[in-house]
């Protein structure tokens, strides 16, 4: 069982602490800011531009990272065990990663319990939402330059649980992270707008309502603009439950409007 874990992935950091492996963690990267206990182990280590010497200085017996760089090969050459948790595409990917981390850290039972609790909470959130005759259409905003996501992403999976339609799916393109035009978004007049750029960029219901032409969209005119914590929306860890519950609340709000 590893006793000196270094985490270079904010998502993996959240998973490690949620399965009770936090005491085995000696260092986390500069983006790992949750839970509070992880902040006590914050360092200048970077998951984006990892420095293998700086990592090795913590004498880790397990390094967890997202596999987005060639760090794995470098750690292998130094004989340092490492675990890769690549960006999840589905809920099953998330559950599998939590279970794998549980096995890798000696917390199999805690990991299984966490997965069971997550499944139950997500099921409950989805079941709590009244079925609407017409599936609402949404726009998910990654940043103020109108980058969005298609349904082909993990974020899209979250909205897909509720049968929501994504306006970005109609864009022709090869990327799952398309940049939409303001004209396109306004012309689509989405029923719901989800802002994942409040922490980074200060976007809010008010700032969106003040954009020229946006006040006429269905979402803005009905007050159906919702803020999602940037971190929660960009990580595929235990707090995805919070994300699902927020979307459930948004759906309940829209259902009330259509019933009203």
Language-model-detected regions and their locations in the chain:
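Extracytoplasmic substrate-binding proteins
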Residues: 4, 71-147, 168-170, 188, ...
């Amino acid at each position: 069982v590893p006793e000196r874990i270094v985490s270079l992935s904010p998502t993996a950091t959240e998973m490690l602490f949620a399965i009770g492996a936090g005491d085995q963690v000696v260092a986390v990267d500069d983006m790992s800011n949750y839970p509070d206990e992880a902040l006590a182990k914050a360092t200048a280590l970077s998951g984006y531009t990892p420095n293998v010497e700086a990592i090795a200085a913590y004498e880790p017996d397990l390094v967890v990272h997202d596999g987005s760089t060639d760090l794995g090969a470098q750690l292998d050459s130094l004989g340092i065990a490492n675990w890769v948790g690549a960006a999840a595409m589905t809920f099953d990917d998330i559950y599998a990663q939590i279970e794998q981390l549980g096995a890798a850290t000696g917390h199999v039972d805690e990991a299984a319990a966490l997965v069971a609790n997550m499944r139950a909470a997500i099921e409950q959130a989805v079941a709590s939402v009244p079925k609407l005759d017409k599936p609402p259409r949404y726009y998910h905003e990654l940043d103020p330059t109108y980058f969005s996501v298609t349904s082909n992403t993990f974020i899209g999976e979250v909205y897909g649980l509720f049968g929501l339609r994504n306006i970005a799916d109609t864009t022709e393109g090869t990327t799952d992270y398309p940049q939409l035009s303001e004209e396109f978004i306004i012309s689509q007049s989405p029923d719901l707008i989800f802002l994942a750029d409040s922490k980074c960029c200060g976007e809010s219901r008010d700032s969106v309502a003040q954009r020229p032409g946006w006040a006429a969209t269905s979402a803005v005119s009905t007050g159906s603009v919702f803020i999602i914590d940037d971190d929660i929306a960009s990580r595929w860890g235990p707090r995805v439950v919070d994300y699902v519950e927020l979307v459930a609340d948004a759906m309940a709000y829209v259902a009330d409007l259509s019933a009203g």
